[in-house]
Amino acid sequence: MDRMAVLARCRIFEGLTPKELQAIAGGAKERSVEAGETIAAEGEGGVGFFVVAEGKARVEREGEVLAHLNPGASFGEVALLDDRGNRRSASVIAETPVTMLAWSSWTFLALVKEHASLGFALATTLARMLNDAYAAHEHAAETPA
């Protein structure tokens, strides 16, 4: 697997230098699961961040499909900033065999300490995600039932 190519497709790493991407790639562990396997379970503790390298997965909350994850998609971003093992807000289920790059929050935070631009990229992405979620919530509240 070309880890650099996988990371280059991931939104959270946009704008990082090749040297920074190389450091991040070096801190990752590869994880593979079979189709139908739960990668992250809603309500369970989580302290890991993942980037889909190969395959497809879906995000579900209370049985409702919220999103589909293709190569380059990430999940578990909040766990990077909060290492208390907070509960996962949704489940991620492999639709095909999936290979991922994975980091524990501790490993990733050590990388952020070495590469400040990574911390800025993470903060920017999380702010965008919060803004998108807020906009979706506002739209849902305004839509008549």
Predicted feature locations:
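Cyclic nucleotide-binding regulatory domains
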Residues: I12, E37-T96
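Absolute protein N-terminus
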Residues: M1-M4, G63
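Hydrophobic residues at beta-strand termini and immediately following loops
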Residues: R31-V33, L69, W103
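Short proline/glycine- and basic residue-enriched helix-capping loop/turn segments at helix->loop/beta transitions
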Residues: M4, E14-A35, R87, E95
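A small-molecule sensor/coupling module
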Residues: R3, E20-A23, L80, N86-A90, ...
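A short hydrophobic beta-strand segment most commonly corresponding to one strand
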Residues: V98-T107
